[in-house]
Amino acid sequence: LHSKDLVNWSIISAAVPAALPPVTTPERPEHGNRVWAPSIRHHNGEFYIFWGDPDQGIFMVKSSRAEGPWSKPVLVKEIKGIIDTCPIWDEDGKVYLAHAYAGSRAGLKSVIAICELSADATQVIGPSRIIFDGHEHHGTCEGPKLYKRNGYYYVFLPAGGVATGWQVVLRSRNIYGPYENRTVLAQGNSPVNGPHQGGWVDTPTGEDWFMHFQDVGAYGRVVHLQPMKWIDDWPVIGTDKDGDGCGEPVLTYRKPDVGKTYPVCTPQESDEFDGYTLSPQWQWHANINDKWAYYAGDRSMVRLYSYPVPDNYKSLWDVPNLLLQKTPSDNFTATMKLTFRPNPKYKGERTGLVVMGMDYAGLILENTEQGTVLSQIACRKADRGGTEKTNDSVAVKDSTLYLRVKFSADGSKVKGTDDLLVRCNFSYSLDGKKFRPLGETFQAREGKWIGAKVGTFCTRPAIRTNDGCLLYTSPSPRDRTRSR
């Protein structure tokens, strides 16, 4: 994502556009694995992104331009359990890396450590030293971001849990401590639960701001921008009404003063498929396979080839060739135009519009013995092996249809949680004008450490042949409203 004012953002590139190394399971999604809490930094004319893979180790990519191309991932250290990595280049030329530990892999969590890197930041050259133990007062501390200001080293970190926690700042005159600590941001009386995993940004005009996320369930991690100032070399974030040094999040505030005014823009959403590559908002469900799709920009379409479902397939949770994107707003409508041309020799080829998460639902076209059938399906607990249930279906003769899902949220919460209650209603049309509802209202659910996504797919049973069905897709512009 790129912005010149911290408010208007667009997607400009993917630092790892294809496959994450080492490619151990290229034909199956790895839910909740691989890239955990990356950090991006700029040093000596180059951008660096570091991340921890809890099963593989510490990785880094770099580029002279944020738009790319980015280097191939470098394995900085092969190790299991290190996550949430963030580098700093010190004035004496030394390079350090702050990180946390994943309890599920390392057998230890709620501590923050620092290690030294080589001058080119391509390898770890010293042992990790624990510089903060949060077990007593700041359990589940993670996501450190490392800075230096006025002779102090600062570590910004969240603690207390993703949806329920707070922001802590450590400071010390020595990189390895001892560190003082202070809680600098908590929910307080605001509706922003668990302000989590934030970073400090200073502007060319001398202002300080803090970006963090809020976990709201099916809509994923929503980014917030908070005002920040320094008092006695401690950051004060949000609004500190009682003057105790711990602020609470604001919902509205003036824009940052960056010296100029920039046009309003939002991350890309709609797509007419008029290019020869996918627009940057699209994400495959697993490492990319070039045989999944053909991009025909001159015809404003993308053609998805039916691809065999994996061995031991239970649901779309197991399918790699889902083409998805994140939800753009609280309330919006997504419409997709597609043409389904199944191979008449094979039954069971499927395509459609899907809302994907640990529970999922969608409008599914399937080639059956009785012809093409459009069904509204839902799958509960897909992450635990759940299977699909058909709520309603109708026979269709037209090969081209418009499929639609309307997302609605009124601020209500899922019982017993801070998650927004998100309702999805499905409909279809033969002409793109008159839409007919189909099936039942679906309550969207998040994925593994991500929000729900919306998109399409094209599959067939495990028939090994190069003669599958074709799917032509071209979505119409999406109607959307923002309540956030």
What is each PLM-predicted segment?
Residues F273, M336, L403-L438:
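Carbohydrate-binding surfaces in secreted/extracellular proteins
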Residues L1, E30, V35-P54, M60, ...:
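Hydrophobic core segments of beta-strands in well-ordered, beta-rich domains
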Residues P280-Y305:
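Extracellular glycan-recognition surfaces and repeat-rich motifs
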Residues Y472-T481:
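Conserved small/polar residues in nucleotide/adenosyl-binding loops
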Residues N312-T372:
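Secretory/extracellular carbohydrate-interaction modules
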Residues W9-P26, K62-I79, S118-G139, L170-S190, ...:
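Blade-edge beta-strand/turn elements of extracellular beta-propeller
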Residues K381-Y402:
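Short, aromatic/His-centered strand-loop micro-motif at the edge of beta-sheets
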Residues F435-T465:
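Flexible glycan-contacting loops in extracellular carbohydrate-active proteins
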